[in-house]
Amino acid sequence: VTKRFVRTVINDQVPETFYDTIRSENRHYRLEQLKFIGDTVNEPVIANLCRREGLDVNIVGANISPMQGSMMSVFILQLIGETDAINEAEAYIDQSGAIRKRLTIDWENRTVMESA
């Protein structure tokens, strides 16, 4: 119930067209959800990711919402590259103050969910 309520306040779903696009992707990638709350909203985390050697960043979904006198941004990113480059990007995100969750795709139901 709480997840459904939060989902109505914060649109963290990927667009339907994304599933067809991602199926055709033949490069190694991971999906990540990044949440920026409060002061972390002002940090150039995604811009810095885009500058990393050997890493492509695709913004799949995004939402920015006021939340109790502050701001919250939620991005769903596709990080594309070799395993080492993606691992380094994840480490950078983790130390940046953003909240990161790795996501997986349930192809049968065409939904994105948090990885186990």
Where are the model-predicted features located?
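Conserved beta-strand-loop-alpha-helix hinge in the C-terminal portion
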Residues: V1-P15
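Non-catalytic connector elements of ABC transporters
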Residues: I22-A116
